[in-house]
Amino acid sequence: MTCPVIELAQQLIRQPSISPDDKGCQDIMIAHLQTIGFTIERMPFGDTNNFWAYRGIGPTLAFAGHTDVVPAGDESQWEYPPFEPTIRNGMLYGRGAADMKGSLAAMIVAAERFVAAHPNHNGRLAFLITSDEEAKATHGTVKVVEALMSRNERLDYCLIGEPSSQHRLGDMVKNGRRGSLTANLTVHGIQGHVAYPHLADNPIHRVLPALQTLVNTHWDEGNEFFPATSMQIANIHAGTGSHNVIPGNVQVQFNFRFSTELTDSQIREQVETILKNHNLNYTIEWILAGQPFLTAKGELVNAVIQSIDQYCGYQPELSTSGGTSDGRFIAQMGAQVVELGPLNSTIHKVNESVSAADLQQLSRIYQRVMEQLIQ
């Protein structure tokens, strides 16, 4: 007997949807949702396909995810072709199996089963799907959220299918994420010959003490939900490539992953104070990739915990660890946001895979969340 979750996951994996190219994945999902009475609104922006689908009225529970995947890399290194889904020893192999086409299949089948059992359900069940999460994330969820907010759409709960599990299905869910703020700093000096330093001004020498101060700064203590804010230097570039030329400029890129104890404005102000105290001639560009967000225990978190406990026999750890996700955009709508998906140990790797049994169980967990919140 075949499993609809696995069949749909395989169908999605067969589409080589390298970000931001959807390659027809959303058409497959939409066909399933239309069959059970969902209203579909396609929302393309730029090079990205998105859709918003909903059924029912009232408090809204949305399932969110992305159809795009990262490139497979050297396909000769794969045990099985990355876009030919293969099941071996209970594992489903293929690019996107864990991140996150397996979750998408589990969501769709959960919705089909939920609607079949509760055709006149209370509340509204919705899907927010994009093909621009793995790359630039500029024409995907962020644009859909902007459009929905502009017309005062209501979103109460959102479950994102990102692969959150660590060692066994459902052992960890993300109920928040740190903010991400990047600085592109250029320190200006005067180019010259290394033999005549008095006729030049070496920007590398000037910036190093300031960077050391930034590295040594204790930004905050964190709190019960978030670790302390982290600042990391990512890139430094200067010089002409010649050993005898003092460079005229040095570019430094550094990133903050920050907790709810700080705002991005406070970080910017503190950084610029340090730079000015070191008498640097500089320009700086700031890129805010996302604000920190947190969903404390409440209806959605409680429903997810209970559903995992029912099907797995244990309760998950709530965590805000890891990088950013599209949850940072959805949280702007005032929704409670939680991320729950399969194990993440093989995501973006050669031989990406997920347990077929886990996907089937994940679909049941998703369905149980629906039943608790909008039945």
Swiss-Prot record:
Signal peptide: none annotated. Pathway: Amino-acid biosynthesis; L-lysine biosynthesis via DAP pathway; LL-2,6-diaminopimelate from (S)-tetrahydrodipicolinate (succinylase route): step 3/3. The active site is at 68, 133 (proton acceptor). Keywords: Amino-acid biosynthesis, Cobalt, Diaminopimelate biosynthesis, Hydrolase, Lysine biosynthesis, Metal-binding, Zinc. Its cofactor is Zn(2+); Co(2+). Disulfide bonds: none annotated. It holds the Pfam family Peptidase_M20. This is Succinyl-diaminopimelate desuccinylase. Its EC number is 3.5.1.18.
